[in-house]
Amino acid sequence: MISISIASHRHGPMARRLLSDLDTYCAGGIEIILTENVPEDPAVDWSLVSVPVKVLRNSEPRGFGANHNSAFRQSRGEFFCVLNPDVRLTSDPFPELLSELSAPHAGVVAPLIVDSGGAVQESARRFPTLVSLLRKALISPVPPDYAIRDEPFSPDWVAGMFMVFPRDVFREIEGFDERYFLYYEDVDLCARLRRKGYEIRLTPRARAIHDAQRDSHRDLEYFARHLRSVLRYLLSRPQRRL
């Protein structure tokens, strides 16, 4: 069974569409745990959606990693999936994702992410350094880190919008580092997986749709959170590279 964790921050309409996709395309063998990080406005009766959902409601807002770690403790599946509420599906991605996790040393797998027009999104990247971050800030557009072809490959890290882990692996690395409230918790987690000898995998044979919101580019609060997470990550590396 696959336990799917979805954290909603007033993403009720998006989450309902995703749940409908899961009901349409994923034929059994899934458990869905949805966390209301803040109360939905207007309120959503999750018992009326087309697929069974276990709902967790926070008394106060928590970070991305904390929400998914909490859902993991409530989950029962052999595999644990972190899934953003604004992702859409057009087919069942899980057979290909689980097939990729059967490879030796696979610690996490992600599908290829495309936007609603079919353009490939940069959801797999090399680990950031101060130099690469400055280059990205000063040069636009920056070429993608990886050329996407048809075959699965092993990037440095994959984005947290859609990740699938073997349960034992997620438990071994103790999940997300909850000191990252938002942003870079996925980078940090993939770095810790690699240090333990696991591979990060992306398979273009599975696809999901995500239209990037880029809140950190528009909102000062999100930008400040992004900057704090970047600094935490760069300063926490055991052998930091410039």
Language-model region placement:
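Glycine-rich, basic loop-to-helix element that forms the pyrophosphate-binding segment
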Residues: 58-75
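Active-site-adjacent helix/loop segment of glycosyltransferases
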Residues: 5, 191-242
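Short, flexible, basic/aromatic active-site loop/helix in glycosyltransferases
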Residues: 130-156
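Short aromatic/hydrophobic "clamp" motif used to bind/position activated sugar donors
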Residues: 80
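Acidic donor-binding segment of Leloir-type glycosyltransferases
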Residues: 19-60
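Conserved donor NDP-sugar-binding/catalytic core segment of glycosyltransferases
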Residues: 91-122
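A short, conserved alpha-helix in the catalytic core of glycosyltransferases
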Residues: 156-207
